[in-house]
Amino acid sequence: MALSMKMRANARVVSGRRVAAVAPRVVPFSSVARPVLRSTFAPEVSIDIRRAGRSRIVVEAVKKSVGDLGKADLEGKRVFVRADLNVPLDKKTLAITDDTRIRAAVPTLKYLLDNGAKVLLTSHLGRPKGGPEDKYRLTPVVARLSELLGKEVKKVDDCIGPSVEQAVASLKSGELLLLENVRFYKEEEKNDPEFAKKLASNADLYVNDAFGTAHRAHASTEGVTKFLKPSVAGFLLQKELDYLDGAVSAPKRPFVAIVGGSKVSSKITVIEKLMEKCDKIIIGGGMIFTFYKARGLKVGSSLVEEDKLELAKNLEAIAKAKGVQLLLPSDVVVADKFDANANTQTVSVEAIPDGWMGLDIGPDSIKTFQDALADAKTVVWNGPMGVFEFPKFAVGTVAIANTLSELTPKGAITIIGGGDSVAAVEQAGVAEKMSHISTGGGASLELLEGKVLPGVAALDEK
C-alpha cells in the first residue's frame, strides 16, 4: 500500500528504509551492531554476545571477518574501512537527525583501534552529481563519531590524492582518519579500477562494514579488494549475513515469512525463494489485491498490477504444489480515498465496495495471522501490512510487530528484513525486542532472494 508522492517527499531515509520525519533521536547502542564470532543457523550452540532473552544461534561463516584478525595482524597496519555513514541531515543546519548508521559502525571501528590499527574510514552520503557538494560532505559525522568512540576523529577533505597521503603518513596506531565522501568521484559508482587502486594505495588491508551498499559493485565496496589483502567483513556486515542468509539456509522450524508492501512485482523473487524454505508465507500490503483480482474478486479502487495477475495465480499454484501455506487476509479496512482522515469500513475481501480502496488488513485477518505465527521458531518480515504511516491504517502492521515481539523471548528468531518493516517496528516501539533488524534496504531483499552481493563475494573466504 504505497505512500503518496507527497508523503515520500516529506519522509527521510534511515538505514536503508524510509520513515516519517521525526525529531532527532538517539538509538540505543544495543539495537544496532553486535560482533558476531561465527556464523550456521544451528540453535544448539550459543553466541553469548547477544542480548539476554534472545534466541541464541551460531552461523558457520564463509567469509573472513574482522574478528578473525588479532593484534598481530592489525597493530600499525593501515586499514581501509568502508562503512555506511549515509545519515539523514537537517536540510538547513546539516545536523544529524538520526545517528543509527554511525552507531552501527562503532563495534568494528573500536575493535580495530583497540588493536592498534591506523583506520582510514570512508562512506558515501547522499547523491552528489559526480563532484564535491558541501551539503554531502561527511563533516557532520566527525563530532558524533568522536563522541561514540571516545577519541578524536581526524578528517581530510578528499578520499584520494596528496592531501590524503599526507594525512595518512602522520596517522599513529590507534587513530582514525575520516576520508571524504567517495561519491564525489563519479568513478566510485562506475567501479573504475584506477580509482579503486588510488583508494587502496594508502592502506594495507580492507574491511567492508557497509551492508547497505553490499549489493552494489562500486570501487569502495568491490574494486578495492583486488588491491588489498586480506579483505574481510566487519562485524555489522557479518551479523547481517548470519541472520539473513542463515535464516533462509537452515531455519529453525516452523519457518514463517511475512511479505508485505504495495507491489507483487517488487517481491516476486523473494516470495519464490522463500517458498523453497518456508512452512508458511503471510501476504499483506497492497499486493494482496492483485491476488484477489486474479481470483476473480472485485477490489474497488485498490492498487492492482494488471500485468501481474497471471503471476499471482502461479505463485498460489506453486505454494500449493510445494505444500507451503500461503495466507492472505480474509478481511480488509477500506477507505473512500487515500488520506489519513478518510472514511473507513471493515469488509470481507469478497465485499469490497466500488470506489473504495483497501489500506490495511482487518481484525479477522490479524487473528488468523497471529494464530499462524504462534508456533513459529523463525520469522522473517519484509514489508508492512498496510499504509502504516496513517494511524487509521497502522493497526495491522502494529499488531504483527507486537506479535513478533512476544515470540522472541519464547525462543523464536525474529528477523526484520529491512525496508519499511524496520520503520514499522520502530513506530510500534518494539524494535528492541526483535532478534535482528537489518540496516539494509535493497541489500536485505537481494540477500533474501538468494542473490550474490558483489560487496560480499569480493571478500576473502576463511
From Swiss-Prot:
<keyword id="KW-0150">Chloroplast</keyword>
<feature type="binding site">
    <location>
        <position position="83"/>
    </location>
    <ligand>
        <name>(2R)-3-phosphoglycerate</name>
    </ligand>
</feature>
<keyword id="KW-0809">Transit peptide</keyword>
<dbReference type="Pfam" id="PF00162">
    <property type="entry name" value="PGK"/>
</dbReference>
<feature type="binding site">
    <location>
        <position position="123"/>
    </location>
    <ligand>
        <name>(2R)-3-phosphoglycerate</name>
    </ligand>
</feature>
<comment type="similarity">
    <text>Belongs to the phosphoglycerate kinase family.</text>
</comment>
<dbReference type="GO" id="GO:0009507">
    <property type="term" value="C:chloroplast"/>
</dbReference>
<dbReference type="GO" id="GO:0046872">
    <property type="term" value="F:metal ion binding"/>
</dbReference>
<dbReference type="GO" id="GO:0006096">
    <property type="term" value="P:glycolytic process"/>
</dbReference>
<comment type="subunit">
    <text>Monomer.</text>
</comment>
<protein>
    <recommendedName>
        <fullName>Phosphoglycerate kinase, chloroplastic</fullName>
        <ecNumber>2.7.2.3</ecNumber>
    </recommendedName>
</protein>
<dbReference type="InterPro" id="IPR015824">
    <property type="entry name" value="Phosphoglycerate_kinase_N"/>
</dbReference>
<feature type="binding site">
    <location>
        <position position="101"/>
    </location>
    <ligand>
        <name>(2R)-3-phosphoglycerate</name>
    </ligand>
</feature>
<feature type="binding site">
    <location>
        <position position="267"/>
    </location>
    <ligand>
        <name>ATP</name>
    </ligand>
</feature>
<feature type="binding site">
    <location>
        <position position="383"/>
    </location>
    <ligand>
        <name>CDP</name>
    </ligand>
</feature>
<dbReference type="GO" id="GO:0019253">
    <property type="term" value="P:reductive pentose-phosphate cycle"/>
</dbReference>
<keyword id="KW-0067">ATP-binding</keyword>
<feature type="binding site">
    <location>
        <position position="389"/>
    </location>
    <ligand>
        <name>AMP</name>
    </ligand>
</feature>
<feature type="binding site">
    <location>
        <position position="358"/>
    </location>
    <ligand>
        <name>AMP</name>
    </ligand>
</feature>
<feature type="binding site">
    <location>
        <position position="388"/>
    </location>
    <ligand>
        <name>CDP</name>
    </ligand>
</feature>
<comment type="pathway">
    <text>Carbohydrate biosynthesis; Calvin cycle.</text>
</comment>
<feature type="binding site">
    <location>
        <position position="124"/>
    </location>
    <ligand>
        <name>(2R)-3-phosphoglycerate</name>
    </ligand>
</feature>
<keyword id="KW-0808">Transferase</keyword>
<feature type="binding site">
    <location>
        <position position="389"/>
    </location>
    <ligand>
        <name>ATP</name>
    </ligand>
</feature>
<dbReference type="InterPro" id="IPR036043">
    <property type="entry name" value="Phosphoglycerate_kinase_sf"/>
</dbReference>
<feature type="binding site">
    <location>
        <position position="86"/>
    </location>
    <ligand>
        <name>(2R)-3-phosphoglycerate</name>
    </ligand>
</feature>
<feature type="binding site">
    <location>
        <position position="285"/>
    </location>
    <ligand>
        <name>ADP</name>
    </ligand>
</feature>
<dbReference type="GO" id="GO:0004618">
    <property type="term" value="F:phosphoglycerate kinase activity"/>
</dbReference>
<feature type="binding site">
    <location>
        <position position="126"/>
    </location>
    <ligand>
        <name>(2R)-3-phosphoglycerate</name>
    </ligand>
</feature>
<keyword id="KW-0479">Metal-binding</keyword>
<keyword id="KW-0934">Plastid</keyword>
<keyword id="KW-0113">Calvin cycle</keyword>
<feature type="binding site">
    <location>
        <position position="261"/>
    </location>
    <ligand>
        <name>ADP</name>
    </ligand>
</feature>
<feature type="binding site">
    <location>
        <position position="358"/>
    </location>
    <ligand>
        <name>ATP</name>
    </ligand>
</feature>
<feature type="binding site">
    <location>
        <position position="267"/>
    </location>
    <ligand>
        <name>AMP</name>
    </ligand>
</feature>
<feature type="binding site">
    <location>
        <position position="84"/>
    </location>
    <ligand>
        <name>(2R)-3-phosphoglycerate</name>
    </ligand>
</feature>
<dbReference type="GO" id="GO:0005524">
    <property type="term" value="F:ATP binding"/>
</dbReference>
<feature type="transit peptide" description="Chloroplast">
    <location>
        <begin position="1"/>
        <end position="61"/>
    </location>
</feature>
<feature type="binding site">
    <location>
        <position position="261"/>
    </location>
    <ligand>
        <name>CDP</name>
    </ligand>
</feature>
<feature type="binding site">
    <location>
        <position position="420"/>
    </location>
    <ligand>
        <name>ATP</name>
    </ligand>
</feature>
<keyword id="KW-0460">Magnesium</keyword>
<feature type="binding site">
    <location>
        <position position="127"/>
    </location>
    <ligand>
        <name>(2R)-3-phosphoglycerate</name>
    </ligand>
</feature>
